[in-house]
Amino acid sequence: MFGFKTTKNKKRVRLLVVAIGVMIFFMCLSNFSSIQSRQSSSTDTPLQQNGKHQVIRVLETQPSININNSENNINNENINNNQNNNPNNNMDNNNKNNNKNNNIDNNNNKNNNNNDNIDNNINNNNNNNNNNNNINNNNNINNNNNIDNTDNNINNNINNNNININNNNKPSYKKPEKKPPLSSSQIFFNSLPPHIQKQVVIREKSNYAQALQYDSYGIVPAKDFFDGLDAVFETKPNYKISTVRKLFNIENLNSNNNNNNNNNNNNNNNNNNNNNYDINNYNNINIKEDDKFENKNYQNGDKNIMYSDYKGIDYGNNNNIEEIERIKEELKIELEKENVNDIFKYRVTIVTQTTVDRLYKVAAMAERWRSPISVSLFIKSQGDIDKLEKAISANKILATFADFHLFYHNNTRYPVNNLRNLAIRNALTEHVLLLDVDFIPPSHLHDHIAHYINLNYLNQDDSLNAFVIPSFSSNLQPKDIPDSKFEFIEMLTKNKIEPSNLKVCPKCHSPTDYTRWMTSTEPYAIEYHWIYEPFLVYNRSQTLPFDERFKGYGFDKNSQIFGMAAQGFTFSVLPEAYIVHINHPTSRWDGPSLDDQQWDSLRVVCDLLPEIRKRYAKGYKVDRLFDEPTTENCYSNDHW
């Protein structure tokens, strides 16, 4: 019996042990689940800040959770939280609430999530909380989770006020805006003396995109064909150390002395033979600024006087009464010395272009011409400006008759047509004579041309007429070029002078008919042929500007003459007129060869010819206007 009871007790003990083990297992399982649940709802991240550990709780918000508006008053605030699970979250708050119980006190909002109280204290001063999540409280709380107060939903972007929490270890300051680098033209402009800067106009350009226009043949010119059109400096030659020609306006010499307003609008009849000037009332002569001068009124005789001052006054300040009075005194002397018809003696301006190393050629031209010259200078550096100022301060003739206008480029081929247009725009008369800087005119040329301009004016001939000036070349020195046609022809017969380029390009000048010119005593008309490129006198207001797509060498001038012929110009050779090119060694140019430059210019010509035909064909479709190449055979050598 005893043995039986012992066995039965052992079984009971075993069952009790098993029951206790099962209970312990389920208790452990329950505790484990509770811990795991808490860990999934919150993460404690220690942060070392100012020598202390601060616990930051990161709320993992679900995209769509209904929030009772009575329990959580989230008032139109956008919370933007760019979370990248960075444990180093620096919160920089003016309130500096370091709550290790994960309680952040919020005056407006209490949000209970998984029994964790998060009280966010956001004061009205929009303090920045930088938790390495850069909380930016400029009335803005962005959380990439839109909280819509109307529906009490968190929708991944909350509008109105935004807090930016950026998980970057960057300070919360606004990065200064990067200024674009200065172009070379701006750098050059900043280096100019102040008195020159005042006279400069910058026109920013970028012309490389024009290469697309020439892609029709599958070949685009080299990049330097378009480079460099970065800025244009257009200046009047009012350097303080130079002498410059000034313009004066005699309006009504019997008017009130206080009427000193540079008025161009004279209702007087324009008549060059006005003899009613009252010299004693010279005090009413008004100084007229160059840039306000309208050449066409000057040409028609509206009493504008061009006057040269030889003492280098700065005319930019008309408030200097002493200077003005002195100028008027000198003008009175000039008026007394000259015949009234001489007041309007300047009818033509030479327009030319060059670089500073050839200023001596401009001086040689001015010595013979003794009339206005408008010069465009290709400027490459501040040193060129210095050379220009030295030249015009040292040479009285250069300073008296030449007006200089600056054109600055980067690295480019010589911008010949840009320079020509600049010189033409700034010419002091409507009629211009286009010359290269290597040419020397005879001393009588201006008056000879002016005579025929006056004939057209008196006859009220407004037709499109251009005067051809026969061109020659020689190895003589400028001082040895004869001033009379008789002596000039003698040198022609001795081969000391010869017609220009007849051997190199017969078509370029042969229409001038040099044989006929040698015996002519009256102007004679000539017939235009393609690629003819004479040196012309014409009214600039009647023509279009030179095409500035041309750079370097080739077709820049004859394409302009073709446009004038298509427009309807007639060409007349003047009997006593001539110019002589002084031969010189070929200039060195660091760039493409002349053949390459000419090839690139040919591409421009082949685009330009159809444009001109379309412009002047008056609605008719024509293959050619003269004997120029058609579009199909534009690249044929037979036409060049």
From Swiss-Prot:
The chain crosses the membrane at residues 15-35. GO terms for biological process: protein O-linked mannosylation. GO terms for molecular function: glucuronosyltransferase activity; xylosyltransferase activity. It is found in: Membrane. Residues 36-640 are extracellular. Residues 65-171 have a biased composition (Low complexity). It comes from Dictyostelium discoideum (Social amoeba). Residues 63-184, 254-277 are annotated as: Disordered. Disruption phenotype: No visible phenotype. Cells exhibit normal developmental morphology. InterPro entries: Nucleotide-diphossugar_trans, Xyl/GlcA_transferase. Belongs to the glycosyltransferase 8 family. Highly divergent. The gene is gnt14. Its main location: membrane. This is Glycosyltransferase-like protein gnt14. Residues 1-14 are cytoplasmic. Gene3D superfamilies: Spore Coat Polysaccharide Biosynthesis Protein SpsA, Chain A. It is a single-pass type II membrane protein. Glycans are attached at N68, N410, N539.
